[in-house]
């Protein structure tokens, strides 16, 4: 499809923060690193624009959003802050498989007085009790086998 482009192979070894028994301080440090990557890549403004476009089409501009594999929830918290400043009728939830990540995310939510609701869940088995207008994930898909990527999408 793209002449001269060599397909890259994915290295799916577990990352430091995925190691069982990892010291919580190390986990927190790893999630802070991801927060820096998200800030540098400016993913929130672009994501917000897409969410806003979806919300414009929704009745009453209501929007329910779920972030999968949220880590420290910095993206969800930032989106919720923008929505709050603009007085948008959005509900944002975020989940992660790792209870320690959710613990760290809860601290972040409290520290920033955010409305993001957090829970522990597997991205490949999200809650079926709720329906979301938008489900997204960032910095996560590289962890999955190709078949699971298709299943997730």
Q: What are the residue ranges of the model-derived segments?
A:
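N-terminal auxiliary segments of SAM/dcSAM-dependent transferases
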Residues: 1-20
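Class I SAM-dependent methyltransferase Rossmann-like catalytic core
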Residues: 16-50, 54-55
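Short helix-loop-beta connector
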Residues: 55-64
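Class I SAM-dependent methyltransferase SAM/SAH-binding core
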Residues: 66-68, 72-125
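Conserved acidic residues
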Residues: 133
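A conserved beta-strand element that flanks and buttresses the S-adenosyl-L-methionine
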Residues: 136
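Hydrophobic adenine-recognition pocket in adenosine-nucleotide-binding enzymes
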Residues: 140
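A short, conserved alpha-helix within the catalytic core of class I
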Residues: 144-153
């Amino acid at each position: 499809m793209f002449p001269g482009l060599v397909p890259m192979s994915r290295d799916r070894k577990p990352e430091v923060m995925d190691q069982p028994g990892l010291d919580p301080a190390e986990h927190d440090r790893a999630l802070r690193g991801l927060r820096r990557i998200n800030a540098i890549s400016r993913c929130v403004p672009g994501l917000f624009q897409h969410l806003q476009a979806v919300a414009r089409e929704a009745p009453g501009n209501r929007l329910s959003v779920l972030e999968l594999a949220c880590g420290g929830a910095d993206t969800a918290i930032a989106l919720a802050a923008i929505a709050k400043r603009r007085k948008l009728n959005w509900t944002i939830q975020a989940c992660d498989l790792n209870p320690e990540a959710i613990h760290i995310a809860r601290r972040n939510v409290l520290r920033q007085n955010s409305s993001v609701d957090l829970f522990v869940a597997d991205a490949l088995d999200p809650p079926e009790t709720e329906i979301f207008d938008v489900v997204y994930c960032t910095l996560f898909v590289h962890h999955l086998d190709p078949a699971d990527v298709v299943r997730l999408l």
